[in-house]
């Protein structure tokens, strides 16, 4: 089973993933080649970022923050006083957006453009403007930079050394091809300089390899993945706990990671989306992507060819709906939701069902002006893929 973000960006996203796990175990399709549940992550190295502890509730290698023994171990390895690490964990970015101004006074946004990519763009902009201080670090100017007090220039994959980890847990070496332009620096260098300015100890790294070795020291599942081993063409899959361990290309061959070695089935009940079409907002808007653009177009819109293919956003509307509303193909129309409005071009098609609209998420003042901030109760993922909207013909919309 291979899935992507579409089934997770709903208030039932966790249930959807659990359903696939149930199906995989029920049919015996797990623990061997060519089977299992395999997520295609939203972009390169999402797996690697999560492995490093980018979640608010885990340290590197998915070591849980709330476990006292793990906190004690991390404090000892990092040379911290006993009890220094908190026994609670933080919130997700979607939750943090709601907390801007109170209690969050300052925010450091790194390689992200939430003004376009997060639901209810109007709300995101209002909340960011409540901050006393906002730093944005990115490789190009974005819509989020417009709200920043300081913008720091990072660099792209081709301008830095390090590792990327694929969805199959394969750790790949990344090697710098060219130097960063101008004042841009590798991300780790910016963090080291910032730590120095703040007077923080333990950040005096000189290279990505030093950082990686420090990570291996505190992360049992990656302890055996030295740079010397990663230089080899076949690379390594974690878990790889020792230098002589071959890595683990396939998980759950003999047993599951649970204490009893057994898999867990989840009993699930159907739950509708948080927001469904009604008399006031009679259309269901589904969001997704286009092949010509990537995420918020921070990179792809700088390509003349890709910009030429799709210079601005559009919404697909069923032929019968367009006929009933007297909307012509290529006409600009108004979409409204309970959160905002957007003015895309209409693309009349039979590729969507009556009562359903489809709109890509790449563009500012587009789909995420409309989408819902309702969260999955477990993952805290917002319901980006589904909301209720109305459609209005604009006089002179041509």
Locate the predicted segments by residue.
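Generic structural signal for well-ordered, non-membrane alpha-helical segments
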Residues: 12-16, 20, 67, 86, ...
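Long, contiguous, secondary-structure-rich segments that constitute the structural scaffold
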Residues: 181-236, 242, 296, 300-316, ...
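Short, solvent-exposed helix-loop connector elements
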Residues: 2-11, 175-181, 203-206
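Flexible loop/turn segments at secondary-structure boundaries
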Residues: 8-11, 44-49, 114-118, 142-145, ...
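Generic recognition of flexible, low-complexity loop/linker segments
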Residues: 26, 34, 91-99, 122-124, ...
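Short beta-alpha connecting loops at secondary-structure transitions
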Residues: 153-155, 159, 169-181, 302
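Long, low-complexity segments enriched in small/aliphatic residues
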Residues: 47-55, 210-305
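Catalytic alpha/large subunits of respiratory electron-transfer oxidoreductases
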Residues: 1-160, 198, 241, 285, ...
